[in-house]
Amino acid sequence: MWDNIVLSGFADEIDPSLDEQIRVLKKLGMNHIEMRGVNGKGLVEYTLEEAKEIKKRLDAEGFALSSVGSPIGKIKITDDFEPHMELYKHTVDLAHLMEAKYIRMFSFFMPEGCEDYSPYKDEVMAR
């Protein structure tokens, strides 16, 4: 029954250190991480070159990423989108490098006091 199930979690809530994350997850019998934060900063803050070192460490320990835990969509729907799009593109590149099939994203913050979100639906989907 458990053969096809991948148990994963945010390991940065265990500890900021990748070494400690791996140690604890191994102890729990896990070998997948939904990587959000590693060694004190968000995965999406790393350059591709820096991320290659993280990937090497994960590979050496027999770990894989179930997904990249990103901040994509954690801006106001009314904010300028272009800088966020650049972060999205970088996150996709990181996901490919890390061989993660999935990226966790959000659906944007709606304006304060907004009770009807329907006018923003098309913009959320376009982004």
PLM region spans:
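A short, Lys/Arg-enriched amphipathic alpha-helix followed by its capping loop at the start of a domain
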Residues: 2-7, 24-30
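Active-site acidic/histidine proton-transfer and metal-coordination neighborhood
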Residues: 3, 17-23, 60, 77-127
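Short polar catalytic/cofactor-binding loops
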Residues: 11-16
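Conserved beta-strand positions in the central sheet of alpha/beta enzyme cores
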Residues: 34, 67-69, 104
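Glycine-rich, proline-tolerant flexible connector loops at the mouths of alpha/beta enzymes
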Residues: 34-59, 107-115
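Glycine-/proline-rich flexible loop or hinge segments
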Residues: 36-40, 69-77
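Alpha-helix-loop-beta-strand connector modules within alpha/beta enzyme cores
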Residues: 48-70, 124-127
